[in-house]
Each structure stands twice: as C-alpha cells, then as structure tokens.
Amino acid sequence: LLSPGPGIPEEAGDLMAAIGQIVRQRIPVLGICLGHQALARAFGAELRQLSAPLHGHPTTLTVTDAGDLLLQKIAPPLIVGRYHSWVVDPDSMPEELIASSHDEAGHIMSFYHRNLPIHGVQFHPESCISNCGPALIRNWLATC
C-alpha cells in the first residue's frame, strides 16, 4: 500500500525507487493519492496542478472502465473524499495504465495496470467522506 503524503512523488524520499522494486517483483500494490500519482509517474505519466486544492472535498465518481476489480460490486453512487492539489494528466497516460473512473471535470480518479497487480486511486478510501472505502479495500485485498 503506497499511502498519501504531501508534495509530489519525486519529493517523497525513496518512493520512486521502491516502486521500481515493486514492479520488478510483481508485488500487488494500491497507491492512494500521492501513491496513485507516483505509480502513474513510474510508468511515464505526467502530473498537472489543479487551479485550487481539493481538501476534504466530496466527489461522485463516474466509473469509465468496468474491468477495474477495485470498483466491482460497489453500488453507485460512489462518493469519495479528496485531499490533493495535483492530478494525473490524462493526455500523458501510458497505454499499460487504464483509467477506470473520473470526477465531474474529467480528472482521472482511479486506474489499473493492464498486466500487473497495480491499482491507483486519487481519492482517500479511508476518509469518512468516502462511502465505498471498505468495499474498495476488500476488493483490493481479494486481488492480492
């Protein structure tokens, strides 16, 4: 589990090196917020700063790829808590990462890797704002 944190992935100590090891060893991983951004960066995606930070902000997800095991068997609406000021740039998403949900503005809120046990969520499933957090974590654990 790659947890949330301040800043951007390249400023997060050995995070990017750790992701390299995770990928090489095919270790199942879930990136949350900063972890989501770091996983995307590790595969070549770029980040984009939002015009205003979203801290403690509820968002309704639109699931755009039903193949994401994290989001299966969760009844809509999926409301999630956001605490970030950066997002993955959708124009830079590599082919091996599949965006699976978006917010109202079209920002990527989750993705999974086409061939590896890698998932990322921009939001915080552990937040009291998120109505789908426990189910999402159970779904992830079932993939491990």
List each language-model region with its residue ranges.
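Conserved strand-to-helix beginnings and helix N-cap segments that scaffold or border functional pockets
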Residues: 12-16, 93, 133-134
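Flexible gly/pro-rich beta->alpha loop and the following alpha-helix that scaffold active-site loops
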Residues: 1-31, 37, 43
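Pocket-forming structural segment of enzyme catalytic cores
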Residues: 20-22, 40-118, 123-131
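Alpha-helical elements of Rossmann-like donor-binding domains used by nucleotide-donor carbohydrate transfer enzymes
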Residues: 17-18, 98, 135-139
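Active-site phosphate/pyrophosphate- and oxyanion-stabilizing loops and adjacent acidic/basic residues
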Residues: 37, 68, 138
